[in-house]
Amino acid sequence: MEPLVELRAYFLPILPVRLVLGLLGLAAARALGVSPSASIWLFGLGAALFGLGMLTTRRRSTFFERAGRAQEIDDARAVESRLRTLARSAFPSTLAVSALTAIALPINASLAALLAGILAGMAVVGSVFGFELVQWEQTRGVRLFALPGQGRELFARQAR
């Protein structure tokens, strides 16, 4: 049986990575000549657009509806390592936006500032969802898990 992915480990450790990558992209755009006001504006615009796009969808509410129906599992079920889970959470979104930011830097540093803002927005949205996930788990005394990939089935184990 394939090891499960702990959702808390999937969503939380990638947050500082995304934020740092976003700030590095902003600093690089500034170093390549984007004015302070334009770079901050573009960075904020990218973060705001991503945040609004993600926080106004029904995905979060449907996730927690599915979480309420999570299949109970015991401690014997294998769980993927934290390092592997971190790598999984970076692909493809964090890696793709980081690569696009790096590609845009020498071509259009203003676009890179916008993309860096999207990375920061990913961190902000992830922290909102991460907070909701931790609160949900703590109120129920469980940890949520999923199969690797795009599996929709969720599993719950009593918190230790």
Segments the model singles out, each with a brief description of its role:
Residues 1-63:
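N-terminal first transmembrane alpha-helix
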Residues 1-10, 141-160:
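N-terminal juxtamembrane cytosolic/stromal segments of multi-pass membrane proteins
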Residues 10-20, 82-96:
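Select subsegments of transmembrane alpha-helices in polytopic membrane proteins
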Residues 27-31, 55-59, 103-106, 127-135:
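Structural signature of transmembrane alpha-helix termini at the membrane-water interface
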Residues 51-71, 132-138:
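Membrane-water interface of transmembrane alpha-helices
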Residues 67-90:
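Short membrane-interface loop/juxtamembrane segments of multi-pass integral membrane proteins
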